[in-house]
A protein has these predicted regions:
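Extended, histidine- and acidic-residue-enriched regions that form the cofactor-binding/catalytic faces
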Residues: 2-134, 142-283
Length: 283
């Protein structure tokens, strides 16, 4: 585990590290147990938490590991806060995921949809060798959402697992919020993500390069727009040369802290329901 303020990058080292906090974060890491200890510690209602991030461009001001850092940090904080009570166990994060909407940019590393689904299927198969039967994807990248929904159902059918997908922070194209300065269109590298990173990993943010790049032309359409009733295929360079879709210039660490606290509160409620969920008696 890293200590708050450590400038090394988890995406490079592969280490587990908490988000900055007043206290040291202690996390229930499944990988720190032996195989027999896992068999003894877990039961059918144990919840394995798999953070799913991404390695992709986030403009000139944010690191390519932004989504990974967000997903892993929130998973660590949630498992540290609620793990004992709800029997949550943290898995290592899935860093390389479905990011080909940023395929054009240096620094983006992605899996095809088919490969990612195969990886998730194999992880689900591996999970069946443990006593746990609840798997929760804690997702930090909007581009993963559709595939995680497919994988959740496939794993339910193939292995009888209880599967869940949690989104602590949704972009505007998936129903999340975007400030007025972004016209409700901020989905990538803008106010929300930059604020989060200013709180979680401020040493990795270059606010001198933060900019506003909002696709205002989309406001001309009622249905074909981010979060509209008609979705459309896009890549991030459709809207500007640096891949930013939003207003990073307005980001603050204070907003990032408030957002982190709100996300953690949501995760506490959501994981409580995940741990107790039963769809009901079968007729």
């Amino acid at each position: 585990m890293f200590r708050p303020g450590d400038s090394r990058n988890a995406a490079v080292t592969g280490a587990q590290r908490p988000a900055p906090s007043v206290r040291r974060v202690t996390v229930r890491l499944l990988t720190e147990l032996s195989a027999p200890a896992i068999a003894d510690a877990l039961g059918p209602d144990s919840v394995l938490v798999l953070p799913t991030g991404a390695i992709e461009q986030h403009g000139p001001h944010l690191p390519v590991a932004t989504d990974l850092i967000t997903a892993q940090s929130m998973a660590e904080l949630a498992v540290a806060e609620f793990g004992e009570e709800l029997d949550l166990w943290l898995l290592p994060p899935l860093a390389y995921t479905k990011s080909n909407e940023h395929h054009w940019s240096c620094g983006t590393f992605w899996l095809s949809a088919q490969t990612m689904l195969s990886v998730l299927h194999d992880l689900g198969s591996s999970m069946t060798k443990t006593p746990a039967r609840r798997l929760a994807f804690l997702n930090g990248h909007g581009g993963n959402s559709a595939l995680l929904q497919v994988a959740a159902r496939d794993l339910r059918i193939a292995y009888g697992l209880r599967t869940f997908t949690l989104h602590p922070s949704l972009p505007a194209d998936h129903g999340g919020k975007s400030p007025e300065s972004e016209l409700g269109l901020g989905i990538h590298g803008g106010h929300e993500e930059t604020s989060l990173m200013l709180h979680l990993r401020p040493e990795l943010v270059d606010m001198e390069k933060a900019q506003r790049w909002v696709p205002e032309q989309l406001t001309e359409y009622r249905h074909v727009r981010f979060g509209g009733s008609v979705s459309f295929g896009w890549t991030s360079d459709d809207f500007g040369p640096d891949g930013v879709i939003g207003d990073a210039s307005t980001a603050t660490a204070e907003h990032g802290k408030e957002k982190t606290e709100a996300m953690l509160a949501y995760l506490g409620e959501a994981f409580a329901e995940v741990a107790a969920f039963d769809p009901g008696p079968r007729s």
